[in-house]
């Protein structure tokens, strides 16, 4: 598929999305209203439109990531700051690549796995076995990528982190009350996985965030590998360190709110007694 047709198909899907996925469009709108109460309704609707356009383009572009030659992937991506990760890999220290749910999440993962010889990440199996196989193969196209199930838990990570094999970790999903703690996210008590802080403390691991932005005008994914967090978690409690991650995520989102993956019900799990937002 040509670059031009790729963007055209993404634009068509963004037009179709609100008509066939009204529930998801509602979730996007609700999340933005919750996180930006100061924004006008016109601004919210503009972000909703932008977010849907970016999200649908990222769906289309998975075909490029999973099937196209590597040079085609490089044509639609621009990686900066890789030296921040390379320094950690050179030392052999346990390393967490902190990858929040921005639109370009999959592009960042594919580009990094094409460079880093070996890595691991958590993976939730799909109900449809055919789709599961497609996704598994797509996410492990280049070099060695270990896809760990949530059932493996920390034990599944131990052998890789101790060998200096980096963990590509997504910190910002709501996996329910049993696996989460409540800490602020945009001033809302949010069920948040404490695993980033727990793993960093347990293995004395360095945490280097990766933040992405899709320029819809050019179709280029800009991938920014940031320096390792200083003194993390340090002397902070697990709750304080997890709140720190959420605060950083807020700062990155505020640069361009439409770039975040708002189609997820980020505030699905509520503290006891609170009403459902969705």
Feature-to-residue mapping (PLM):
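A generic structural signal for short
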Residues: 17, 73, 123-124, 145, ...
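Catalytic core of membrane glycerolipid acyltransferases/transacylases, capturing the structured
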Residues: 91-151, 177-184
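Non-catalytic C-terminal accessory region of glycerolipid acyltransferases
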Residues: 20, 39-49, 87-90, 114, ...
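Membrane-anchoring hydrophobic helices of lipid-metabolizing enzymes
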Residues: 1-99, 134-136
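Generic structural marker for isolated residues within well-ordered, non-membrane alpha-helices
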Residues: 29, 109, 135-136, 196, ...
């Amino acid at each position: 598929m040509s670059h031009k047709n790729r963007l055209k198909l993404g634009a068509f899907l963004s037009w179709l999305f609100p008509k066939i996925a009204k529930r998801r469009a509602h979730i996007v709108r609700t999340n933005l209203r919750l996180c930006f109460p100061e924004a006008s309704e016109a601004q919210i609707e503009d972000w909703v439109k932008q977010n849907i356009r970016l999200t649908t383009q990222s769906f289309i572009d998975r075909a490029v990531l999973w099937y196209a030659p590597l040079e085609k992937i490089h044509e639609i991506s621009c990686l900066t700051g890789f030296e921040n990760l390379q320094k950690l890999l050179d030392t052999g220290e346990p390393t967490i690549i902190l990858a929040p749910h921005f639109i370009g999440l999959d592009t960042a993962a594919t580009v990094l796995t094409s460079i880093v010889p070996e890595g691991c990440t958590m993976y939730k199996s799909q109900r449809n076995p055919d789709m599961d196989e497609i996704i598994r193969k797509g996410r492990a196209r280049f070099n060695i990528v270990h896809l760990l199930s949530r059932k493996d838990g920390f034990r599944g990570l131990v052998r890789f982190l101790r060998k200096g094999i980096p963990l590509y970790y997504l910190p910002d999903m709501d996996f329910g009350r049993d696996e989460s703690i409540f800490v602020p996210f945009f001033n809302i008590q949010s069920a948040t996985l404490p695993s980033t802080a727990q793993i960093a403390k347990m293995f004395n691991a360095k945490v280097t965030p990766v933040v992405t932005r899709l320029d819809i005008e050019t179709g280029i994914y800009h991938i920014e590998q940031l320096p390792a967090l200083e003194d993390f978690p340090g002397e902070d409690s697990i709750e304080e360190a997890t709140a720190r991650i959420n605060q950083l995520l807020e700062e990155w989102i505020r640069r361009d709110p439409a770039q975040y993956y708002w189609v997820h019900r980020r505030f699905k799990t509520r503290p006891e007694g609170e009403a459902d937002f969705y």
